[in-house]
Each structure stands twice: as structure tokens, then as C-alpha cells.
């Protein structure tokens, strides 16, 4: 006889863990719940519905995951945590999905799509603070590009790829 591995999700336990985490944070701190990869196999939509109105953002890995949440009626902002090819910007704007912006060219393309759809496309600046993985470098050229981006009709928030602790 063969046995399948199965993950049983206790939504009461998930809610308890969420509440404990939220209670430890200052009120002014925003909470982003990462539910990429179908919440690591636990069900992104059920967890998103459970935390709806209490989580400040949901983080996902790709456009398909973000659209799934939006089509399920999730109103909490959804942020894709990695780069999104420009060919998906139409859906990004259509479904009001937030994306990280890594350069001026992408910001201009996203802004143009938002203008085309007569909508605002919120995005997050991605600043590289030491890992040299993703984001604007901390230098004058990047500062100038970020300043130019702020003149586009679609600005929202800031996030970073922090340095690891040594």
C-alpha cells in the first residue's frame, strides 16, 4: 500500500499565528503576508480570505498568482515580489496589481500603460541595500532615475532587498 503525503491546514491555527504576529508589531508597521506558490501548498485564496482586511499586502511570485487572488475577490493590495516582464503590464494595470520597479525604462512603460487604461498603477521602488540582487543601486545615477520616476503619474511606497546579517 502506498501513502500520499498530505498537508492539512488548520485555519484556526493560521489565524492565531497571524494575530500573534500582528500583536507584536507597532500599529504603524505594515504587514505583508507572503502567500506565493499557493501559500507554499497551503492554499493562497483561503488564507488571503482569512486575513482579508487585516493584512496590509499579500506577496506573490508571479502574475498568475496575483490574478488568481484578484479574480477570487481579494481587495487587499497584491505585490509581485520579483521582476515582471513588460508584456504583462496590461494585466498589472487592469487587475490593480502592484509591482516592484527596478529601472526608469520599466517605470515609463508601466506609466504609459496606466495612461492608456486611464488608471493609476501603484508600484514600489526596489532599492538594493547590499545584496546586489535586485533594485536600484544607491548612487547618483539611480537617485536621478528615481527622481524622474516620481514625476510619472503612478507612485506608491518603497521596499528593499536588505543585506543579510553577518
Where do the model's predicted regions map?
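Active-site-proximal beta-alpha core segment in soluble small-molecule metabolic enzymes
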Residues: 5-8, 13-16, 29-158
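Glycine-rich phosphate/diphosphate-binding loops that line cofactor/substrate pockets in enzymes
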Residues: 22-27
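Conserved small/polar residues in nucleotide/adenosyl-binding loops
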Residues: 159-166
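Gly-rich Lys/Arg/Thr-decorated short loops/hinges at beta-loop-alpha junctions or inter-strand turns
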Residues: 1-2
Amino acid at each position: 500500500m502506498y501513502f500520499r503525503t498530505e498537508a492539512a491546514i488548520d485555519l484556526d491555527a493560521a489565524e492565531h499565528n497571524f494575530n500573534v504576529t500582528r500583536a507584536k508589531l507597532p500599529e504603524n508597521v505594515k504587514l505583508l503576508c507572503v502567500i506565493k506558490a499557493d501559500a507554499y501548498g497551503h492554499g493562497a485564496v483561503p488564507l488571503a480570505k482569512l486575513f482579508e482586511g487585516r493584512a496590509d499586502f499579500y506577496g506573490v511570485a508571479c502574475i498568475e498568482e496575483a490574478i488568481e487572488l484578484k479574480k477570487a475577490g481579494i481587495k487587499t493590495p497584491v505585490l509581485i515580489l520579483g521582476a515582471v516582464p513588460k508584456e504583462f503590464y496590461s494585466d498589472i494595470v487592469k487587475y490593480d496589481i502592484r509591482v516592484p520597479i527596478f529601472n526608469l525604462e520599466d517605470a515609463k512603460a508601466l506609466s504609459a500603460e496606466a495612461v492608456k487604461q486611464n488608471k493609476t498603477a501603484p508600484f514600489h521602488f526596489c532599492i538594493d541595500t547590499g545584496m546586489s540582487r535586485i533594485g536600484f543601486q544607491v548612487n547618483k545615477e539611480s537617485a536621478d532615475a528615481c527622481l524622474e520616476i516620481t514625476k510619472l503619474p503612478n507612485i506608491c511606497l518603497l521596499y528593499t532587498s536588505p543585506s543579510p546579517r553577518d
